[in-house]
């Protein structure tokens, strides 16, 4: 899980999701998981 100021899709399988007011990226590749600060 990378925590970044700006999250973006890295590959085609990445999905942007809003959870509890935070923007997250979920992906089949675990290295692509991100969360906004």
Swiss-Prot record:
| A Gene Ontology cellular-component term | ribosome
Keywords for this protein: Chloroplast, Plastid, Ribonucleoprotein, Ribosomal protein
Q: Which PROSITE patterns match?
A: RIBOSOMAL_L36
Q: What is this protein called?
A: Large ribosomal subunit protein bL36c
**Family of this protein:** Belongs to the bacterial ribosomal protein bL36 family.
HAMAP family noted in UniProt: Ribosomal_bL36
Pfam families xref list = Ribosomal_L36
> Which GO molecular function annotation, any one, does this entry have?
structural constituent of ribosome
Lineage, top-rank taxon, reads Eukaryota
**UniProt-annotated location(s):** Plastid, Chloroplast
Give the encoding gene's name. rpl36-A
Q: What is the lineage of its organism?
A: Eukaryota, Viridiplantae, Streptophyta, Embryophyta, Tracheophyta
**What GO biological process terms are annotated to this protein in UniProt?**
translation
